[in-house]
């Protein structure tokens, strides 16, 4: 049974129907997957082999390596945003972080297929199965990231489950730690109450300030928020509204 579709250039793209999973997973449950002890333990050769070949002694020509991962798509789903961002920022390493195992496997296969069909492209994106609400500091150093994305996260409607939301005052402390000053955090949802919640948390946090609307509209990333992902496309097909909050990491004198 085939699990792929033809991609441009002769590669094979995986079919989503073979990788279906629940819309969301419980971020507070204990899942079993390897977690690096520290950012220094992250094996970049597994994610970006063109830039970080596992065989250091090979005579093959190695591409000049960007220094470190700079973008993180938290809860990346089927990887649409990563695929859209890759050609816009070809010299920037970016990673998707996804808790669902089948969805993570789909994104891995999708990236491999795109690399095979488009030599020299999509080498700067990858995905890892992990729980971002627990392990962000295990993957990124202080001030490492320049962009973080939270697109259509689980709304956790019940008040008792609000502690599972991926944007909270406590988690924003962690996100601020791994973001460089001037870095941008992007959020979008089709649930108005969640949109208000995320904006309120960011407005209250002392290390973030809202990005002016004219700057948002000029940002080439902004359009991708509502077009690149499976969720955003579903909202558009259904004629739904979206609610975004985009904030900049700022500095405090005591930092």
Swiss-Prot record:
Task: Give the molecular function GO annotations.
Answer: tRNA (guanine(46)-N7)-methyltransferase activity; tRNA binding
Q: Which keywords are on file for this protein?
A: Methyltransferase, Nucleus, RNA-binding, S-adenosyl-L-methionine, Transferase, tRNA processing, tRNA-binding
SUPFAM superfamilies recorded for this chain?
S-adenosyl-L-methionine-dependent methyltransferases
| Compositional bias segments (type: Basic residues) | 13-23
Question: What Pfam family is a match, any one?
Answer: Methyltransf_4
EC annotation? 2.1.1.33
Provide the Gene Ontology terms for cellular component: nucleus; tRNA methyltransferase complex
Q: Which residues form the active site?
A: 154
Q: Where is this region: Disordered?
A: 1-35
Which ranges form a coiled coil? Answer: none
TM segments?
none
Against PROSITE patterns, the record matches this protein to:
SAM_MT_TRMB
| One GO BP annotation of this record | tRNA methylation
Compartment(s) of residence: Nucleus
List the catalytic activities from the record.
guanosine(46) in tRNA + S-adenosyl-L-methionine = N(7)-methylguanosine(46) in tRNA + S-adenosyl-L-homocysteine
Q: Give a yes or no for keyword NADP in this entry.
A: no
Specify the superkingdom.
Answer: Eukaryota
Q: Which residues bind S-adenosyl-L-methionine?
A: 75, 98-99, 131-132, 151, 229-231
What CDD domains does UniProt report for this protein, alphabetically?
AdoMet_MTases
This molecule's function is given as: Catalyzes the formation of N(7)-methylguanine at position 46 (m7G46) in tRNA.
Give the protein family.
Belongs to the class I-like SAM-binding methyltransferase superfamily. TrmB family.
Protein name according to UniProt? tRNA (guanine-N(7)-)-methyltransferase
């Amino acid at each position: 049974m085939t699990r792929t579709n033809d991609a441009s250039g002769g590669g094979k793209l995986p079919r989503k129907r073979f990788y279906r999973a629940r819309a969301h997973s419980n971020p507070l449950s204990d899942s079993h997957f390897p977690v690096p002890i520290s950012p220094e333990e992250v094996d970049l050769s597994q994610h970006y082999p063109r830039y970080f070949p596992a065989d250091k002694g090979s005579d093959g020509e190695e591409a000049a390596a960007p220094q470190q991962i700079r973008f993180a798509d938290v809860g990346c789903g089927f990887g649409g945003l990563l695929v859209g961002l890759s050609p816009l920022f070809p010299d920037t390493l970016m990673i998707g972080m996804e808790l669902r195992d089948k969805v993570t496997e789909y994104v891995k296969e999708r990236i491999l297929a795109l690399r095979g069909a488009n030599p020299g492209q999509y080498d700067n994106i990858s995905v890892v199965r992990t729980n971002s609400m627990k392990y962000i500091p295990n993957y990124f150093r202080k001030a490492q990231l320049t962009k973080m994305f939270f697109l259509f996260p689980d709304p956790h409607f019940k008040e008792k489950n609000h502690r599972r939301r991926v944007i909270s005052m406590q988690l924003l402390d962690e996100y601020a730690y791994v973001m460089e000053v001037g870095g941008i955090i992007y959020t979008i949802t089709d649930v108005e109450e969640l949109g208000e919640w995320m904006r309120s948390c960011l407005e209250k946090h002392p290390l973030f300030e809202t990005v002016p609307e004219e700057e948002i509209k000029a940002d080439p990333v902004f359009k991708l928020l509502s077009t690149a992902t499976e969720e955003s496309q579903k909202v558009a097909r259904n004629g739904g509204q979206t609610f975004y909050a985009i904030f900049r990491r700022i500095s405090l004198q005591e930092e």
